């Protein structure tokens, strides 16, 4: 189904019960986040807050709060159909000429889709029905959300930032958060490798000291929004890809104050410039990791014009501990990634980015193994093939019969097929997300690959598997009692898959180095143990959503992994997934996001009136 603009999409979602209008007055500061978070975690509808307290502009949240709504926004009936989108992207990334007449006929549908790629220029665009400029520019009139109690300022989140490098033929669309500073200034937070940052860098080289034009569009049609977060080939513009998704050309219009082309149907557009010499401290903000990030300097975006539709809608979201809307988007886009990877690596059966791993910090791959060392090639491929995976800290590679999305199967394969030291690959000093406070320094850290496949004979030649006697169920209870006696800080011990091969422990951490003490105690009791994961008391050791979140947010693999090797014995691996204390890390550690009890109580008191699930 085609959606010509955001309002068309909202209307369809409302018709199928996937959008709820909230007429009750709600404060954009904290209250909308609490309501949106509860709704998303329950798999609920998109929300349109019609009466934000203190503002005349409605606020739309949770638009892509379920994978199904992402699929609908891409014009697909269900999530599985997103693999067809991935196949199209894989084809466009590396097109193959027809092998003959019949093959050409088979490819006709693709060629017809490509015809929808050119954009269509609109002179009198809806997004410019109202224009604020000069002293009329006032972001205080826009209901920009404040999400968490310790956020430094309101945060603009869903804007499509449009830039163009001086040497590029096409524009770049990216989504970068923007801290509101004043009526006409925000901080543009983009990572160094992202398109907008690269465009600015090129501009500063060719136009030193000159202002860099930027436009930011809020509330575009769903295909354009999703085109900005999808891994489109470098040769394809996001607008062109949106045309492919929609089945019709993307309508654009020139900004009033610069030459950048913006979505013609956008609800609100900010136009202005970045002064290459103007910076400001950004943050802290509660982000998608579940923590507040560090304060960093970023460029300031000065807004010279605000254009909008009549009676505009402000599209917003929040980020927090998974699941949040970015995590849900990650689940849906995961299906797009699979065919792209399979075209390059046909041996890949499935590819999974667990949302609890912040949607990109861990990848589980299943493959049809074809030669010794094959798993390591796949690890390297994941890290190097797509920019989206350059920050993936952990890559787990399993055989094809393992369900990559079932932790009981993945962990069983780890226990059965791995010698931890032999089958682990560690790479240090690699690019890491600057928001990852667990890395030793900003932007640089380590990555770990785990080869969970069955080993071939040649792979065992230098390091054969060692058989260990299993602790009986009768003995396990006594061993656990001894461990807890030695380590009173232990809160709970979980034996994954009902044996001691893999043990997950939660502790009330008392000092730096506590995790190693726990590992040593477990290894002293369980000869067969291969893996110990030590977590803090806020982790449910029976819940792999909790465990993976702790592992991916609180570990630098090289620093926080301990190997124990003895001649004639299977090696052992200990993962310290606790929050690090002074002396255990160099950087300021992240502070977990905590909800404001007063806000929670306020929403509790009006929850039934909202009728979100009625």
UniProtKB/Swiss-Prot annotation:
Residues 460-584 are annotated as: Unknown insert. Its cofactor is a divalent metal cation. Its main location: membrane. It is an enzyme of class 4 (lyase). The keyword DNA damage does not apply. Pathway: Cofactor biosynthesis; ubiquinone biosynthesis. It is a peripheral membrane protein. GO terms for molecular function: 3-octaprenyl-4-hydroxybenzoate carboxy-lyase activity. One of its GO terms (cellular component) is plasma membrane. Its EC number is 4.1.1.-. It comes from the Bacteria. Pfam families: UbiD, UbiD_C, UbiD_N. Keywords: Cell membrane, Decarboxylase, Lyase, Membrane, Ubiquinone biosynthesis. GO terms for biological process: ubiquinone biosynthetic process. InterPro entries: UbiD, UbiD-like_C, UbiD-like_N, UbiD_Rift_dom. It is found in: Cell membrane. Belongs to the UbiD family. Catalyzes the decarboxylation of 3-octaprenyl-4-hydroxy benzoate to 2-octaprenylphenol. Homohexamer. This is 3-octaprenyl-4-hydroxybenzoate carboxy-lyase. It comes from Aliivibrio fischeri (strain ATCC 700601 / ES114). The gene is ubiD.
């Amino acid at each position: 189904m085609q959606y010509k603009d955001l309002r068309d999409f909202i209307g369809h979602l409302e018709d199928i019960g996937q959008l709820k209008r909230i007429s009750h007055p709600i404060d954009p500061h904290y209250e909308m986040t609490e309501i949106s978070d509860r709704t998303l975690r329950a798999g609920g509808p998109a929300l349109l807050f019609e009466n934000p307290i203190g503002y005349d502009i409605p606020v739309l949240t949770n638009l892509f709060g379920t994978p199904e709504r992402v699929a609908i926004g891409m014009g697909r009936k269900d999530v599985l159909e997103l693999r067809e989108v991935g196949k199209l992207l894989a084809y466009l990334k590396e097109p193959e000429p027809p092998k003959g007449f019949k093959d050409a006929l088979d490819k006709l549908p693709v060629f017809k889709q490509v015809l929808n790629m050119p954009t269509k220029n609109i002179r009198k665009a809806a997004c410019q029905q109202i224009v604020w400029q000069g002293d009329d520019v006032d972001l205080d009139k826009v209901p920009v959300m404040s999400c968490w109690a310790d956020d430094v300022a309101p945060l603009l989140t869903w804007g499509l930032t449009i830039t163009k490098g001086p040497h590029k033929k096409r524009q770049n669309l990216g989504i970068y958060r923007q801290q509101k500073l004043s009526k006409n200034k925000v901080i543009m937070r983009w990572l160094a490798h992202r398109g907008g940052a690269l465009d600015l860098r090129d501009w500063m080289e060719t136009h030193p000291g000159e202002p860099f034009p930027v436009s930011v569009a809020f509330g575009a049609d769903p295909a354009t929004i999703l085109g900005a977060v999808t891994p489109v080939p470098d040769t394809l513009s996001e607008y062109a890809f949106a045309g492919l998704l929609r089945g019709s050309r993307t309508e654009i219009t020139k900004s009033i104050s610069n030459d950048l082309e913006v979505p013609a149907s956008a609800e609100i557009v900010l136009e202005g410039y970045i002064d290459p010499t103007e910076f400001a401290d950004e943050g802290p903000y509660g982000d998608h990791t579940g923590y507040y990030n560090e304060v960093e300097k970023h460029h300031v975006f000065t807004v010279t014009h605000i254009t909008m539709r009549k009676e505009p809608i402000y599209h917003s979201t929040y980020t927090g501990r998974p699941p949040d809307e970015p995590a849900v988007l990650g689940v849906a886009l995961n299906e797009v990634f699979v065919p792209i990877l399979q075209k390059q690596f046909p041996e890949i059966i499935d590819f999974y980015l667990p949302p609890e791993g912040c949607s990109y910090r861990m990848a589980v791959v299943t493959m049809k193994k074809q030669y010794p060392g094959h798993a390591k090639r796949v690890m390297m491929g994941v890290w190097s093939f797509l920019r989206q995976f350059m920050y993936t800290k952990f890559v787990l590679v399993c055989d094809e019969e393992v369900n990559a999305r079932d932790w009981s199967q993945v962990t069983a394969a780890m226990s059965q097929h791995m010698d931890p030291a032999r089958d682990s690959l560690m790479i240090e000093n690699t690019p890491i997300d600057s928001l990852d406070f667990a890395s030793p320094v900003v932007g640089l850290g380590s990555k770990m690959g785990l080869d969970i496949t069955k080993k071939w004979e040649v792979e065992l030649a230098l390091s054969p598997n060692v058989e260990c006697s299993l602790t009986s169920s009768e003995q396990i209870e006594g061993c656990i009692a001894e461990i807890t006696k030695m380590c009173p800080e232990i809160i709970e011990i979980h034996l994954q898959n009902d044996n001691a091969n893999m043990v997950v422990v939660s502790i009330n951490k008392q000092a730096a180095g506590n995790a190693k003490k726990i590992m040593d105690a477990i290894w002293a009791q369980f000869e067969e143990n291969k893996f110990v994961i030590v977590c803090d008391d806020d982790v449910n050791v029976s819940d792999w959503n909790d465990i993976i979140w702790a592992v991916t947010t609180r570990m630098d693999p090289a620093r926080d992994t301990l190997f124990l090797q003895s001649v004639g014995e299977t090696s052992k691996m200990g993962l310290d997934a606790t929050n690090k204390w002074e002396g255990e890390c160099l950087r300021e550690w992240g502070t977990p996001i905590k909800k404001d009890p007063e806000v929670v109580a306020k929403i509790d008191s009006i929850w039934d009136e909202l009728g979100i699930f009625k």
